[in-house]
Regions:
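Secreted/periplasmic proteins that engage bacterial cell-wall peptidoglycan
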Residues: 70
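Extracytoplasmic
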Residues: 58, 66
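Rhodanese-like catalytic fold shared by cysteine-dependent sulfurtransferases
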Residues: 2-4, 9, 13, 28-52, ...
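Bacterial N-terminal signal peptides
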Residues: 16-27
Length: 262
């Protein structure tokens, strides 16, 4: 290779390296997408998707109604905190579901709606979103990653009274944590529940809490003096490895009365 040819080779190589470096720098300038911004990204869908970060924002600012599109029995067993459900009986025609949503928004079909169900392969949110669009709704989106991803990202999940009673009286597969003080627990408590005072959790974390150590998917149901106290426990457990945590947003007295009822 002559000195002239060698010089041309070195120059071309340097130019190629510079071009590659500029592409790399341009790529790195864009912020990397995190799992919170992720969507499934399916093509040719009639409604757009939103991410977990979008759902968090919607719940924080109230800019849309978060609608759980699953059956009522699934909703009461655990749903994204702040979500609503207007599902009619399973045998009802599609028009009845659409009418229920229209009632929920007070007839305003431009109202922003975000629908979700049981994750990527669940069809409920897709089906209802398409029915709503066909009925004239103009601002319908889907959180297609759904409840499984919400739990994975430690999002708070509420369980309704009906769901708590079913788990406590019939299913009996859950661990129950009572967030009231030790004195309140000693005075009155529900059989089989564990006392994990919310005020101590704030100060000391979950040290000493009887969390399952062999199965991190064990269902854990939290309650307290009221929903705010139960939420303290939920937020603390959301920072742990436990994957199946729900909290009751009502009061202890409400729960105690219902548990004692035949």
């Amino acid at each position: 290779m002559t000195s002239f040819t060698q010089a041309r080779f070195v120059k071309a190589r340097a130019a190629g390296f510079a071009a590659a470096l500029s592409v790399l720098m341009l790529g790195s300038a864009a912020p990397a997408q995190t799992i919170l911004q992720a969507t499934i990204g399916e093509p040719n869908q009639k409604t757009a998707e939103v991410s977990t970060a979008d759902v968090r924002r919607v719940l924080a600012d109230g800019s849309a109604i978060l609608l759980d599109t699953r059956k009522r029995a699934e909703y009461v067993a655990g749903h994204i905190a702040g979500a609503q459900n207007v599902a009619p009986p399973a045998s009802a025609p599609a028009s009845e579901y659409v009418a229920a949503v229209e009632k929920l928004v007070g007839g305003d079909k431009s109202k922003a709606l975000v629908l979700y169900c049981n994750g990527p392969n669940c069809q409920a949110s897709k089906q209802l979103s398409e029915q709503l669009v066909a009925a004239g709704f103009t601002n319908v989106r889907r959180y297609q990653l759904g409840l499984p991803m919400w739990r994975t990202m430690s999002g708070p999940v509420e369980i309704e009274l009906e769901g708590v009673l079913r788990v406590y009286k019939v299913d009996q597969t859950a661990v129950f944590f009572d967030g009231r003080s030790a004195d309140e627990f000693a005075t009155k408590s529900l059989s089989g529940t564990h006392n994990v005072p919310a005020d101590k959790v704030k100060a000391e974390g979950l040290r000493g809490a009887p969390t399952p150590s062999n199965d991190f998917n064990t269902r854990i149901v939290l309650f307290g003096r009221d929903g705010a106290q139960a939420r303290v426990l939920a937020d603390a457990l959301g920072k742990s490895a436990m994957q199946n945590v729900s909290y009751f947003p009502g009061t202890f007295e409400e729960l105690a009365v219902a548990v004692k009822a035949p």
